[in-house]
Amino acid sequence: RLICDFVLGGNCSRGVDANSKRTSNYSPTGFLNKKFINPDLTKSKTGADYTNTPWPLIRLAELYLGYAECLVETNHLDEACTYLNKVRTRAGLPGVKEAWEQFGKEPAKATTKEGLRDIVRNERMNEFYLENQNFWDMRRWLLAEKYFNVKVKGLNIDAENINDFGEVQEVVFERKFQSPMNYLMPIPSADINR
């Protein structure tokens, strides 16, 4: 599912000298994302091109993976694998049990409730990358403080060659998630005063 091109410079760097140093409009992690970017559009000489693109409110994969998650929690593991496989097949991947038996470090992981729960969560993270689902999933699973309090890491955007670019660096910005406070959302006053 993941295809990468590595390019030095461009929007992945802060710039090379005092005249070109950037304080914004660059990727601090070195990763630029192309999901949902129309490949026919490129930046023109006179400005940026744009197009209106429909955005799905809910995708079939979300229904399948949500249902698979429910099936795992109610101990219907074989049926959960069926719905996981519908998403994996569309992406050109082998079935979940087959993949774990052949390529996984834990071949029996897809046969246990805890293992399949982890697999469903990982599938959701991969499938809904950049679709703002992970934030809500982590809160729903009560895992946000575990994952949202770690330091962000990225590539070495100041590198001058491709080997140094691949070195993992800590990115200088802090994330804080406080439990239980950040698991809760305020109720708007307009709703309270109805």
Question: Model-predicted segments: where are they?
Answer:
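Acidic/polar-rich alpha-helix caps and helix-coil junctions
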Residues: 2-194
